[in-house]
Curated annotation (Swiss-Prot):
Residues annotated to bind substrate: 49, 136, 148
Protein name: Glutamate 5-kinase
UniProt function note: Catalyzes the transfer of a phosphate group to glutamate to form L-glutamate 5-phosphate.
UniProt-annotated binding residues for ATP: 9, 168-169, 210-216
Pathways per UniProt: Amino-acid biosynthesis; L-proline biosynthesis; L-glutamate 5-semialdehyde from L-glutamate: step 1/2
Keyword Nucleotide-binding: yes
A Pfam family matched in the record: AA_kinase
SMART domains recorded: PUA
Superkingdom as given in the UniProt entry: Bacteria
């Protein structure tokens, strides 16, 4: 089979009735498809929205709440109810499911990242289907992933999935908004995510959830840079998940980078928090960006920030001002200042294994989303 390990993301609009409440029939349809794929030998992860939709009615709200506290309370109730729906339906097919609630901290903190990766690996190896959502009942903006499109991409990269499928109410990326532009055409295969692709994503998508088409392009960037291809397709067909796994569903396919980022490089690229800035000369800039070399102390022109040994810093080309990438330093700021002042700068500040170059696609990720 081409895609053994698959991460599916199902959004709010794919799980709810017209009044915004949870549709048990839609949940049942999803679990039936998961069961069929599981029985065919696939390893599956489901990133599922729907906690607020499942819980607001039980708390007496007439419609989906808008206040943060009301939404968090609804999510707290709904997480259990939603998982019960998934668990009950999957157990009918003798399939075990597991709930994992994540926040951005679980990706930023390397220890927690490792723990989450290990837990998911055990679940997959034991034949369980992890059902993942952001921990909406307690999460705050500072540690919030923000949408389940992004979360699903981060999870797919973490477990080195063979495919990420983003199910939505639009059957792929169009050249315009298919709801208002009759000339809009679906892009079936996207080799590179650039500004033109981002501009195309601006108008399409659903207003029911927090993840429109633009967030799906962000997710596709994270996943494809990590070596995971992405398929955006419609959830409206009863067998859309099965067809996506078999590549027979209509949609948009985003090609993965041939040499995707491994775990350490993913962490550096997407999650590591920079504690300072380093400016380098032309020779060092070329060595880093074009030849994959380590950053030598002799190439450093200037340093800024109160960083310590082992911290992450951002490196800039002094001549152009362009950001080159991020890396883990072998000297703290004060020690580096002494070395540079002594004019005996020999040795390495950042080893190439602790370095990630910022590609145009990753740069767009930081500046456009």
């Amino acid at each position: 089979m081409k895609y053994k390990r698959i991460v599916f993301k199902v959004g709010t609009s794919s799980l709810t009735n017209e009044d915004g409440s949870l549709s048990r029939s839609k949940v049942k349809d999803i679990t039936q498809q998961l069961a069929m794929l599981h029985e065919a030998g696939h390893e599956l992860i489901l990133v599922s929205s729907g906690a607020i939709a499942a819980g607001f009615g039980a708390l007496g709200f007439k419609k989906r709440p808008t206040k943060i506290a009301d939404k968090q309370a609804s999510a707290a109730v709904g997480q259990g109810l939603l998982l019960e729906e998934y668990t009950t339906n999957l157990l009918l097919r003798q399939i075990v499911s597991a709930q994992i609630l994540l926040t951005q901290d679980d990706f930023v903190d390397k220890r927690r990242y490792k723990n989450a990766h290990q837990a998911l690996s055990v679940l997959l190896n034991r034949g369980a289907i992890p059902i993942i959502n952001e921990n909406d009942s307690v999460v705050i903006d500072e540690v919030k992933v923000g949408d389940n499109d992004t979360l699903s991409a981060q999870v797919a990269a973490m477990v080195q999935a063979d495919l990420l499928v983003l199910l939505t109410d639009v059957d792929g990326l169009y050249t315009g908004n298919p709801n208002s532009d009759p000339r809009a055409k679906r892009l079936e295969r996207i080799e590179t995510i650039n500004r033109e692709i981002i501009d195309m994503a601006g108008g399409a998508g659903s207003s029911n959830g927090t993840g429109g088409m633009l967030t799906k392009i962000k997710a596709a960037t994270i996943a494809t840079e990590s070596g995971v291809p992405v398929y955006i397709c419609s959830s409206l067909k009863s067998d859309s998940m099965i067809e996506a796994a078999e590549e027979t569903e209509d949609g948009s396919y985003f090609v993965a980078q041939e040499k995707g980022l491994r775990t350490q490089k993913q962490w550096l690229a997407f999650y590591a928090q920079s504690q300072g800035s380093i400016w380098v000369d032309k020779g060092a800039a070329e060595a880093l960006s074009q030849h994959g070399k380590s950053l030598l102390l002799s190439g450093i022109v200037e340093a800024e920030g109160a960083f310590s040994y082992g911290d992450i810093v951002t490196v800039f080309d002094k001549e152009s001002g362009k950001s080159l990438g991020k890396g883990r330093v072998q000297f703290g700021a004060s020690a580096l200042e002494d070395i540079l002042r002594s004019q005996k700068a020999k040795g390495v500040l950042i080893y190439r294994d602790d370095w990630i170059s910022i590609t145009p696609e990753i740069q767009l990720l930081f500046t456009e989303f």
